[in-house]
UniProtKB/Swiss-Prot annotation:
Residues 1-28 form the signal peptide. It comes from the Eukaryota. Residues 415-425 have a biased composition (Basic and acidic residues). Keywords: Signal. It comes from Chlamydomonas reinhardtii. The gene is Ezy-1. This is Ezy-1 protein. Residues 167-187, 272-307, 412-453 are annotated as: Disordered.
């Protein structure tokens, strides 16, 4: 009984569990064979990210656009334009310079200048445009004379580098000089020449500001002035002058210059021809005082004749450089020799043109490019009879060459056989070569060139 009951209960439990299991096949079937289809796994597209019309090369896509980018592009275009224009201008300038060089070669090769004067003036006008230098009629006449004598031009090619200071020798002050020349005929020409000389020295020293070595020369001249000055307010030591700035030197030099020139022994007498009251030479000899008076008379005579315009004559200029200025301040003598063209008569100042019409020539110069050997060679060309130069320093050669080259430029142009012109006296240290024995008793023009100077 109990067994049948247990079996019956087991069957009922199995039947109930079977009903439960019978209701689950649907769920089990969903897992094996789902009734709803799901999408497949996610895949990355391999096609272009951008549209085909915009992904092509050269499609004009601007990756970055801003005001800075626009400015950079404009700046690049402007620089390219300026560079192209500069290249064109440089080529044009080189072509023009080559044409002028050819003009110069033609002029140097021509024996006579009668038919070539228009070409010379045209070349000078072109040089005026390039160099910014004005040429007056007197300079044109000198250029024609030089071109008419190629041998003289060849010598002056080297001399111009020594004497030419870059000044156009122009006519800015010509009106003032003409007025002063007219006044000299009515009054004391020597005194006016002395005042004009002092003004020219001021201008010559003021020009040192524009020179590369100007501060060095400026300082050396101030040292000489301080050393010779008796003014208590101007007393300075050499070390203090070395420490001065350019502005302080510029203020001190004009304060000392007039007194320095007035007290320089024999300098004023070279202009006025009058012996200085109470002046005594260092060597106690009266010979130099007499020579200074003679030289001063020559200077006044030359100014009254209209040739020098109240400016130092050749001999007087040599006196200033050799006997006075150089003895007190060698640096000042060198600076004045450099600036001689600005202080000389107009026909001498025209020598500055030589440097302009010979741009292709290479030469020396008082700034150091002229070697001692070149200076000796050039000096012997200017003065073939000079000797005794072995012990002369380079500075001595520079200011003597500067003086003689100016004289050489204005010698009268003849057929090449003209008599030897009168030459200025050299310093007493220069020894003249004696003429041969058979010529010593002949009265020649060279007799006035005495070796005892």
């Amino acid at each position: 009984m109990q067994l049948s009951n247990s079996l019956r209960s087991a069957r009922s439990a199995a039947a109930s569990s079977g009903c439960a299991l019978a209701s689950r096949p649907v769920v089990a079937c969903r897992r094996v064979t789902p009734s709803v289809t799901r999408p497949g796994p996610f895949t990355i597209a391999t096609g272009p990210l951008l549209p085909a019309s915009r992904s092509k090369a050269g499609g004009g896509i601007r990756v970055f656009s801003s005001a800075l980018y626009e400015f950079g592009q404009q700046l690049k275009e402007d620089l390219d334009h300026d560079l192209s224009r500069a290249r064109v201008d440089a080529i044009a300038n080189k072509t023009r310079i080559a044409e002028l060089e050819q003009q110069r070669r033609i002029l140097m090769a021509v024996g006579g200048m009668a038919d070539d004067e228009p070409e010379l003036k045209a070349a000078l006008m072109q040089l005026e445009e390039i160099l910014g230098v004005s040429f007056n009629e007197l300079q044109l006449m000198l250029a024609e004379t030089l071109a008419d004598h190629p041998a003289k031009m060849d010598n002056l090619a080297a001399m111009a580098a020594v004497v030419g200071t870059g000044s156009d020798g122009g006519g800015d002050e010509s009106g003032d000089r003409d007025t002063a020349d007219a006044a000299d005929a009515d009054g004391d020409g020597g005194e006016r020449a002395w005042l004009r000389f002092k003004a020219d020295v001021h201008a010559c020293l003021a020009d040192l500001r524009n020179r590369k070595d100007g501060i060095t020369l400026h300082r050396a001249i101030v040292k000489d002035m301080v050393r010779a000055s008796s003014n208590p307010g101007a007393r300075r030591s050499s070390s203090s002058v070395d420490k001065m700035a350019r502005q302080e030197l510029d203020r001190l030099m004009p304060f000392l210059l007039d007194d320095f020139l007035d007290k320089m022994p024999g300098l004023k007498a070279a202009f006025t021809g009058k012996a200085e009251p109470g002046a005594e030479g260092d060597d106690g000899e009266g010979e130099e005082e007499g020579e200074a008076q003679d030289v001063g008379e020559d200077a006044v005579d030359s100014s009254s004749s209209g040739g020098g315009g109240g400016v130092l004559s050749c001999a007087a200029w040599q006196q200033v450089l050799g006997r006075t200025v150089r003895a007190v301040s060698p640096t000042l003598a060198l600076v004045l020799a450099r600036g001689y063209l600005a202080m000389a008569p107009r026909q001498y100042r025209a020598l500055a043109l030589v440097r302009m019409i010979l741009p292709g020539k290479t030469g020396g110069g008082v700034d150091g490019a002229l070697t001692r050997k070149e200076g000796l060679s050039l000096l012997k060309k200017l003065r073939p009879g000079i000797s005794g130069l072995a012990d002369k320093d380079k500075q001595w050669l520079e200011w003597v060459i500067a003086r003689l080259a100016a004289e050489f430029a204005v010698q009268s142009a003849g057929d090449g056989h003209e008599p030897e012109p009168k030459r200025p006296e050299l310093p007493p240290t220069a020894v003249q070569r004696k003429p041969p024995a058979e010529e010593q008793h002949k009265p020649t023009a060279g007799a006035r060139d005495s070796p005892n100077m």
